């Protein structure tokens, strides 16, 4: 069997995402090779991707949402050089690909919501613009509580609600499991979900999530606004888990959904 000559792309992905899981890297490389076969071009270098970017994009038009999202993400990571300035052409390609991924993610979330919500949950479901209004109001009420030396039960819950909603407003929403298994103290970096600081950047590392056994750990960038909230919350929350019940234990997935509906 002939070994694929796409070392440059693989090395570039590793440079751009040094914390990438081997399983994710393998998936990305397989995706790039498969797209290359589909368009009849051997994609061996970053220049090849740039040269054939329109063919790559158009070849995925008829793909299902998840497949297209995974393949486009592979090309985005390959092109998104974190260490050197990128050309306007590459920046525009990345923007085009990212816009498509965002649309697909939104459609996927909407589809899963329509399929998975119970009738009771559908009654509690509110549009995104209303979520932002609720979040703005909650932020005004919660942020002063970070300055208090001690919190009563109601204040603690108010802050936790703010943290919880921040997870769904400041970054793309994830499943309940991703946060019920999230720890802020006594972290096992092989098994738990946790916050990782690396230089000036901060990440969420997910070891436990749907399909983690097949895909492996996921690492995502988080904005400074969310990082600051988590750090301040860690100072107020004496327990191991990011989100806890009245006994200081991790909350279940259904309970987390209940909390969201009550906010």
Q: Can you name each region flagged by the protein language model?
A:
Residues 219-263:
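Active-site/catalytic core of tyrosine-dependent DNA strand-transfer enzymes
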Residues 87-147:
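Flexible interdomain linker/hinge and immediately adjacent N-terminus
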């Amino acid at each position: 069997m002939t070994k694929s000559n796409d070392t440059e792309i693989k090395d570039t992905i590793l440079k751009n995402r040094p914390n990438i899981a081997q399983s994710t890297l393998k998936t990305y490389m397989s995706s790039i090779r498969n797209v290359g076969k589909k368009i009849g071009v051997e994609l061996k270098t970053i220049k090849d991707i740039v040269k054939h970017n329109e063919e790559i994009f158009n070849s995925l038009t008829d793909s299902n949402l998840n497949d297209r999202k995974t393949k486009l993400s592979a090309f985005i990571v390959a092109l998104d050089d974190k260490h050197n300035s990128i050309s306007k052409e590459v920046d525009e390609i990345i923007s085009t690909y990212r816009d498509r991924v965002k649309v697909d993610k939104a459609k996927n979330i909407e589809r899963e919501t329509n399929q998975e919500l119970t009738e009771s949950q559908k009654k509690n479901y509110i549009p995104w613009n209303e979520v932002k209004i609720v979040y703005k109001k909650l932020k005004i009420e919660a942020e002063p509580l970070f300055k208090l030396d001690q919190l009563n039960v109601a204040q603690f819950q108010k802050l936790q609600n703010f943290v919880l909603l921040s997870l769904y407003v400041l970054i793309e929403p994830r499943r309940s499991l991703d946060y019920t298994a999230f720890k802020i103290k006594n972290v096992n970096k092989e098994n738990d979900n946790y916050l990782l600081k690396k230089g000036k950047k901060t990440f969420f590392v997910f070891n436990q999530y749907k399909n983690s056994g097949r895909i492996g750990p996921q690492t995502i960038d988080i904005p400074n606004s969310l990082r600051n909230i988590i750090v301040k919350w860690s100072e107020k929350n004496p327990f191991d888990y990011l989100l806890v019940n009245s006994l200081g234990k991790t909350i279940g997935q259904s309970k987390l959904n209940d909390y969201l509906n009550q906010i």
